[in-house]
């Protein structure tokens, strides 16, 4: 037993201040600008020689993609990737380490640590990008995801809808190393990690620009509505929306369990086939949230798209769809509009005034201040009808959600799918980009405000110093003599002559 104990490795214990937060034993979350404070205690069961102790805060992305072969004789393979995008080191005072470097048996050595979670990564974390927008997105701190032992909300462990092929983790790591006598190689005597859940503050970004040929999103659709299966046309129905405000989740360590909500506004336009046709009776409108996770084993230079994953074997895609609500819209009120002279004139030259029906930028497709969609392709300048539908959106409480983000290997994006039924055979659908953002923690918000104020004062001081030490001209002022003008009495003839050619000629008459 003594010989077995002598072979024991040093015991490392990592304690983190406030690690359980307001939810008891449930692991707490930390946000950007939050401070991680704690202590590392190391106890050796016997005298142990070492050379270095490393305490660091590490962020890592891990992915894998299975490669399936269609050939029966070829086995499928798997490619994987790991990216350490963040590593902060805690300096250790030399006086806290024993000299010589031998941990005495039974003695406990304590090392405090302090880390501040940064708002963004260092530039070296992303070396491959196609433009500054991609780089800026990749340098944002990604959230913890893919670990069911720490994901949750409101004190409950919940599914964060991440596939096993992608994981982002943070941890405080401690390594005790020694240089091997035989070859000088650094070997690890013992190491230990403590998981930390990071939920960074994420601000809302500008709405996504959706083109007419976008396969992932659609903000406008129009369809022909018929009177019956074998009957004539009733008219054209246009369904249009724009990207709603983001769903904003509470900050880290928040006790707020209020519903996370936003709303989407859908605008309908009906262009009747003739003046006698009335708007169709609306059916139900269902809303679903599509949660999409993109992952890759090679760094990406662009924002991911669904079609890319079908062509590039190093990329993968995983999606889950959550039902949000289903509402009857039969009571929607239609508003009748008489076309203006400009709208009637536009029908005579649609090539100039009407854009492709697939274009989804509502700032261009809306008609004036009334937010009326542009006419359908078959609009002939007749009376038309519009209706507005307000769709409330609320995140389910049986899942947990991470903010929208893009990193070199992993991305998480969300989409709102809206489907409006008109009859048993006709429906219109929209695929709307939707952002999920996150508030700062109270500590992080306070730290950010102090930092912004300090930076503002520093900029003012630098501007004042620049003004003080700015170079000044010591040359005499330039005097411009007029080429013409009245001279004092008696000096008319001795006035300075005007310039001639490129030189200045002066005539002086001596008065006697």
Which residues fall in each region the model found?
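A surface-exposed loop-and-adjacent beta-strand signature within N-terminal beta-sandwich domains
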Residues: 1-160, 165, 173-224, 303, ...
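Intrinsically disordered, low-complexity Ser/Thr/Pro-enriched regulatory regions
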Residues: 1-31, 35, 73-89, 116-118, ...
């Amino acid at each position: 037993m003594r010989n077995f104990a002598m072979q024991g490795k040093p015991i490392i214990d990592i304690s983190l201040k406030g690690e359980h937060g307001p939810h008891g034993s449930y692991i707490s979350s930390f946000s950007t600008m939050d401070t991680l404070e704690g202590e590392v205690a190391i106890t050796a069961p016997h005298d142990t020689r070492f050379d270095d102790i490393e305490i660091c805060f590490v962020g890592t992305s891990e992915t894998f993609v299975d490669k399936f072969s269609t050939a029966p004789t070829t086995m499928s393979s798997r490619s994987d990737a790991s990216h350490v995008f963040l590593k902060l080191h805690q300096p250790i005072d030399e006086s806290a380490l024993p000299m010589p470097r031998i941990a005495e048996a039974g003695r406990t050595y304590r090392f405090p640590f302090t880390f501040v979670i940064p708002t963004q990564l260092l530039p070296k974390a992303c070396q491959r990008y196609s433009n500054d927008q991609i780089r800026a997105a990749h340098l944002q701190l990604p959230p913890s995801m893919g670990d069911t032992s720490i994901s949750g909300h409101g004190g409950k462990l919940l599914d964060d809808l991440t596939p096993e092929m992608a994981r982002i983790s943070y941890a405080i790591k401690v390594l005790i190393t020694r240089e091997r006598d035989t070859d000088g190689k650094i070997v690890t005597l013992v190491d230990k990690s403590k998981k930390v859940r990071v939920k960074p503050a994420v601000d809302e970004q500008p709405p996504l620009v959706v083109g007419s040929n976008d396969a992932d999103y659609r903000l406008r659709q129009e369809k022909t509505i018929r009177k019956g299966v074998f009957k004539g046309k009733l008219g054209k129905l246009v369904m249009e929306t724009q990207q709603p405000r983001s769903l904003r989740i509470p900050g880290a360590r928040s006790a707020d369990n209020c519903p996370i909500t936003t709303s989407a506004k859908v605008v309908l336009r009906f262009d009747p086939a003739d003046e006698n046709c009335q708007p169709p009776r609306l059916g139900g409108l269902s809303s679903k949230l599509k949660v999409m996770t993109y992952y890759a084993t090679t760094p990406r230079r662009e924002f991911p798209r669904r079609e890319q994953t079908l062509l590039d074997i190093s990329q993968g895609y995983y999606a889950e769809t959550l039902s949000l609500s289903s509402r009857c819209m039969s009571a929607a009120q239609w508003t009748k509009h008489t076309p203006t002279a400009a709208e009637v004139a536009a029908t005579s030259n649609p090539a100039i005034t009407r854009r492709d029906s697939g274009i989804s930028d509502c700032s261009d497709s809306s008609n004036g201040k009334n937010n009326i969609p542009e006419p359908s392709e078959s609009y002939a300048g007749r009376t038309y009808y519009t209706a507005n539908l307000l769709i409330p959106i609320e995140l389910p409480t049986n899942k947990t959600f991470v903010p929208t983000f893009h990193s070199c290997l992993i991305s998480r994006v969300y989409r709102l799918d809206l489907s409006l039924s008109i009859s048993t055979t006709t429906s219109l659908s929209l695929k709307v980009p939707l952002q999920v953002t996150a508030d700062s923690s109270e500590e992080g918000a306070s730290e950010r405000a102090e930092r912004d104020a300090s930076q503002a004062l520093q900029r003012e001081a630098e501007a004042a110093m620049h003004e003080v030490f700015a170079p000044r001209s010591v040359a005499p002022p330039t005097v411009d003599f007029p080429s013409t003008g009245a001279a004092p009495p008696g000096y008319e003839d001795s006035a300075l002559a005007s310039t001639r050619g490129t030189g200045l000629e002066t005539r002086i008459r001596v008065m006697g």
